[in-house]
Amino acid sequence: MIESHDDELTWFEAEGASLPETEEQGFVENDGAQIWYAAFGSGSPVLLLHGGLGHGGNWAYQVPVLVESGYRAIVIDSRGHGRSTRDTQPYSYDLMATDVLAVMDALNIEKAAVAGWSDGACTSLILASKDSSRVAGVFFYACNMDPSGTKETGTFIRGNTTTAANSVAGPSCLRQKIR
């Protein structure tokens, strides 16, 4: 049976895996929103970007593994998700990429590896496309960067994300089948 909850963050914190304790967390103001982040461990930074309607706690199983492997794991709640606020601007991956850069700047991170799923994957590709000098590498999955099988909802999907995916991964990479 599938259950639905009005406040998924509260439910997940009570019923799902929880992030480890950390004193390194807070908010960064960027373009009208307060963006929440938490950092764990030390070493080379790895940014973890969640999917739409998710939050940083969705990475609770991965954070300890990254820390034990010698990485500094940073989770970020996208604007309007989890603990982060939003303003009246429409959501866009470009805007969310600037939120990630603002967190990187606040934490004095020059360059980081980025892992993202779904909307977090789209944001990571936009980030790598716009400011490749700040991105050591991108691991992305469940990313809808090729809209050919979806109903067109505007130039946002067709323009920005496809261009970003092609510039980072190349069009042939997006068409490869997993065997």
For each feature predicted by the language model, list its residue ranges.
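Conserved HGGG/HGGXW glycine-rich cap/lid loop of the alpha/beta-hydrolase fold
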Residues: 33-83
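Flexible "cap/lid" loop of the alpha/beta hydrolase fold
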Residues: 122-130, 135-167
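Conserved catalytic-core motifs of eukaryotic protein kinase domains, centered on the activation segment
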Residues: 58-60, 84-90, 149-152
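Alpha/beta-hydrolase
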Residues: 167-179
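Alpha/beta-hydrolase fold catalytic core
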Residues: 1-46, 68-71
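Active-site loop/oxyanion-hole signature of alpha/beta-hydrolase fold enzymes
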Residues: 68, 75-115
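Catalytic nucleophile serine of serine hydrolases
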Residues: 84, 118, 142
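Structural signature of beta-strand start/N-cap positions in the alpha/beta core
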Residues: 45, 72, 110-113, 134-137
